Amino acid sequence: MSDLKAAALRALKLMDLTTLNDDDTTEKVVALCHDAKTAVGNTAAICIYPRFIPAAKKALREQGTPEVRIATVTNFPHGNDDIEIAVAETKAAVAYGADEVDVVFPYRALIADNEEVGFELVKQCKAACGDITLKVIIETGELKEEALIKKASQICIEAGADFIKTSTGKVPVNATPEYARMMLEVIRDMGVAKTVGFKPAGGVRTAEDAQAYLAMADELLGAEWADNMHYRFGASSLLTNLLNTLEVTDETADPAAY
């Protein structure tokens, strides 16, 4: 197997296969669940709006892949600084049956030099999650500066985040290798690689992109680190590219899904 194919297979199993569109329907989410099951393995998770969680849980169970985790989003996509609303949304997501919650950090508050609201929001959302994985989206493309990106990453980790995530995918600039390196360096430098993961999201579209991101993680945190407990790709179109790279033609797949 070529290096690119090996990276593609690895990336596929680290994907949070995502649909977070205004026109999402139950049918689209069920189709996403079907796409998460491939001939070469399943994606780590799907990422959907909270209201679709019950339908997704049923679809994943019926197709024999209950181990595919269900991630959802809260305080999304604007990252407002109302802690009460973010916590209420997170509690609701947990009640719906989410396995993982991706919450948006109040990044504009940090830009305005308010560190406390972000810390408190993450801390309280983690308390609402309990054992459920909490990923915190810092919106790197809006923070822009290395000092702010590293500060946001540190605050999230200190407040109890299980993952730090680059982006919502809803702003002009999402994940970039440059931003990813900054965030991975924080995980390394704080000595929290055992307990904190990383998720680039938005803009990771090809096997080559995924290969470069994984190579960076291997370089900074060791070749064994980027497993599905510590690394995810938030993406939608990436899956088709990975399957093409792997030359997968799944007879049982719905051709319309690709």
UniProtKB/Swiss-Prot annotation:
<dbReference type="GO" id="GO:0006018">
    <property type="term" value="P:2-deoxyribose 1-phosphate catabolic process"/>
</dbReference>
<comment type="function">
    <text>Catalyzes a reversible aldol reaction between acetaldehyde and D-glyceraldehyde 3-phosphate to generate 2-deoxy-D-ribose 5-phosphate.</text>
</comment>
<dbReference type="InterPro" id="IPR011343">
    <property type="entry name" value="DeoC"/>
</dbReference>
<dbReference type="Pfam" id="PF01791">
    <property type="entry name" value="DeoC"/>
</dbReference>
<keyword id="KW-0963">Cytoplasm</keyword>
<feature type="active site" description="Proton donor/acceptor">
    <location>
        <position position="102"/>
    </location>
</feature>
<dbReference type="GO" id="GO:0016052">
    <property type="term" value="P:carbohydrate catabolic process"/>
</dbReference>
<feature type="active site" description="Schiff-base intermediate with acetaldehyde">
    <location>
        <position position="165"/>
    </location>
</feature>
<protein>
    <recommendedName>
        <fullName>Deoxyribose-phosphate aldolase</fullName>
        <ecNumber>4.1.2.4</ecNumber>
    </recommendedName>
</protein>
<keyword id="KW-0704">Schiff base</keyword>
<keyword id="KW-0456">Lyase</keyword>
<comment type="similarity">
    <text>Belongs to the DeoC/FbaB aldolase family. DeoC type 2 subfamily.</text>
</comment>
<dbReference type="InterPro" id="IPR023649">
    <property type="entry name" value="DeoC_typeII"/>
</dbReference>
<dbReference type="InterPro" id="IPR013785">
    <property type="entry name" value="Aldolase_TIM"/>
</dbReference>
<dbReference type="GO" id="GO:0009264">
    <property type="term" value="P:deoxyribonucleotide catabolic process"/>
</dbReference>
<dbReference type="InterPro" id="IPR002915">
    <property type="entry name" value="DeoC/FbaB/LacD_aldolase"/>
</dbReference>
<feature type="active site" description="Proton donor/acceptor">
    <location>
        <position position="199"/>
    </location>
</feature>
<comment type="pathway">
    <text>Carbohydrate degradation; 2-deoxy-D-ribose 1-phosphate degradation; D-glyceraldehyde 3-phosphate and acetaldehyde from 2-deoxy-alpha-D-ribose 1-phosphate: step 2/2.</text>
</comment>
<dbReference type="GO" id="GO:0005737">
    <property type="term" value="C:cytoplasm"/>
</dbReference>
<dbReference type="GO" id="GO:0004139">
    <property type="term" value="F:deoxyribose-phosphate aldolase activity"/>
</dbReference>
